[in-house]
Swiss-Prot record:
This is Estradiol 17-beta-dehydrogenase 1. Its main location: cytoplasm. NAD(+) binds at residues 3-32. It is found in: Cytoplasm. The gene is Hsd17b1. Favors the reduction of estrogens and androgens. Uses preferentially NADH. The active site is at 156 (proton acceptor). InterPro entries: 17beta_DH (IPR011348), NAD(P)-bd_dom_sf (IPR036291), Sc_DH/Rdtase_CS (IPR020904), SDR_fam (IPR002347).
């Protein structure tokens, strides 16, 4: 029987790396994996993991692919010697963290280019053949940040919300062509993402008013204490296999059910008020913003007390609403920089 040909983007670290090695080393030896990276200079950890797991010869091939470049996508597609991709995994992603007004527009555009347009470029390149063959699976690494808005992650959440709409729309159409699309909704995941977050091009915190800067600094302090609750990427990769092997795959698979109560809150109250109030309460309830404060006024409350609860985007730290609803925890965004942006 022919191997299942899988192409995965964003395999330099994290979920992409672990999924590529997990499939290539599977006992069934039924997968041929094309693990793609934006820059082949970053393939060292992937090669090391493949050797450690004993991936059989020919089970894993590493390709250069930059999801921001249609020509790069086409070149990688041409390198697939089987002439087909049975499972496409859109995993490459970029994060941006900080007050919205502090972000450079080119940093905002970079996030949207990778997370949204990059996924669209991959779909445009590989969907036509899947539809012609009446066979194929598309798995997209999604996020709790695509199901609910979170402060200081406005741009990241906007990009992930876009993926939800994109994939849900395709999920209605594609079964007519024998193709299925699934979103793997991740919570907090232990990855190297927080080590890749950087300031500089992400923006200048000084652009934000003093009150917003105070809230942001307060908000960041909860990451360290929340990191311990994050899932391991190996655990999350098994969910991808579940979606790949399901006879009739679902649109969404959740790596944790801890944030589902808030997701339900958004649908049960279409006005959005219940969710907004709950998130505001959990994120900022220990800070009392002075009524009628002038621009630059101080915010009362203990500046050394982190928010009561935090959660994390897959590979990107975000606030969480947990104390009452049981969400999962988060990654730490590395050094104390004003804004953060992930390199891919």
């Amino acid at each position: 029987m022919d191997s299942t040909v899988v192409l995965i983007t964003g395999c330099s670290s994290g979920i992409g790396l672990h999924l590529a090695v997990r499939l290539a080393s599977d006992r069934s030896q039924s997968f041929k994996v094309y693990a793609t990276l934006r820059d082949l200079k970053s393939q060292g950890p992937l090669l090391e993991a493949a050797r450690a797991q004993g991936c059989p010869p020919g089970s894993l091939e590493i390709l250069e692919l930059d999801v921001r470049d249609s020509e790069s996508v086409a070149a990688a597609r041409a390198c697939v010697t089987e002439g087909r991709v049975d499972v496409l995994v859109c995993n490459a992603g970029r994060g941006l963290f900080g007050p919205l007004e502090a972000h450079e527009l080119n940093a905002v555009g970079a996030v949207l280019d990778v997370n949204v347009l990059g996924t669209i470029r991959m779909l445009q390149a590989f969907l036509p053949d899947m539809k012609r063959r009446h066979s194929g699976r598309v798995l997209v690494t999604a996020s709790v940040g695509g199901l609910m808005g979170l402060p200081f992650h406005e741009v990241y959440c906007a990009s992930k919300f876009a993926l939800e709409g994109l994939c849900e729309s395709l999920a209605i159409l594609l079964p007519l062509f024998g193709v299925h699309v699934s979103l793997i909704e991740c919570g907090a995941v232990h990855t190297a993402f927080h080590e890749k977050l950087e300031g500089g091009p992400g923006g200048a915190l000084e652009r934000a008013d003093a009150q917003t800067r105070h809230l942001f600094a307060h908000y960041q302090r909860g990451y360290e204490q929340a990191l311990s609750e994050a899932q391991d990427p190996e655990e999350v990769t098994e969910l991808f296999l579940t979606a790949m092997r399901a006879p009739q795959p679902a649109l969404r698979y959740f790596s944790t059910n801890r944030f589902l109560p808030l997701a339900r809150m958004r649908t049960e109250d279409p006005s959005g008020s219940s969710y907004v109030e709950a998130m505001h309460r959990e994120a900022f309830s220990d800070l009392q913003v002075q009524e009628g404060a002038k621009a630059g006024a101080q915010v009362s409350g203990d500046p050394d007390t982190p928010p009561r609860a935090l959660i994390c985007l897959p590979e990107c730290a975000i606030p969480r609403v947990t104390a009452e609803l049981g969400w999962s925890a988060s990654d730490k965004p590395g050094q104390n920089k004003s804004c953060y942006q992930q390199k891919i």
